[in-house]
Amino acid sequence: IYIIFLLFFNLLISDNTIESLNEFFKNNLEFVQTSFNTINNSFDKSYGNFSRDLNNNIKIEINSPFKEIYFINEDGIEIHELEFNQKRFIKNQDIPNNILKFIKNGFRNESLDFEQIDDFKFKITEFEKNYYFEFISNDTLQIKYKDNMNLDNLINFSKQNDK
């Protein structure tokens, strides 16, 4: 009975964590993305906003250092590079990882390689890439990962006061 209780308790914790993650990404968010620039040994930062409309489409605005807008829908990502007046589209099947798809469609415990580290930290592994999530507070979520160029990235999402 003790082992069954522990298994049930672990499933309950991971379900609650997944649900908290899904609920978090329903909010309007501000974010800071930090990555290490290996060419000049410095940290590069991008600042922006994340929002979701009533049709579950996502809009990501990069405000600095470059002005870009990403529209994510069921077909893929439309990218507007405002400073260069360029627009391009990437189909869902051409997106190299599923993290954006998870954020758009929701994280589901049964489809994830999910590891609970503690009450506030967990790891999702997808195609041999690790994504580390940590709830810093109810209003702040941090994601750490290596990108497709094997550079360390850190994104801090914070809830905006308006929902």
What spans do the regions from the language model cover?
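Hydrophobic h-region of N-terminal signal peptides that target proteins for export
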Residues: F5-S14
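Positively charged n-region of N-terminal signal peptides that target proteins for export
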Residues: I1-I3
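An acidic-aromatic
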Residues: D53-N98, N148-N153
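A short, Trp-centered hydrophobic/proline-enriched beta-strand micro-motif
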Residues: L21-N41
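Amphipathic hydrophobic-ligand
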Residues: S42-N49, I69-I72
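Gly/Pro-enriched, hydrophobic low-complexity segments
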Residues: E115-K163
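Flexible, surface-exposed loop/linker segments and immediately adjacent secondary-structure boundaries
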Residues: N85-F122
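Short, solvent-exposed coil/turn segments at beta-strand boundaries
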Residues: F25-K26, F50-N57, I72-G76, I117-D119, ...
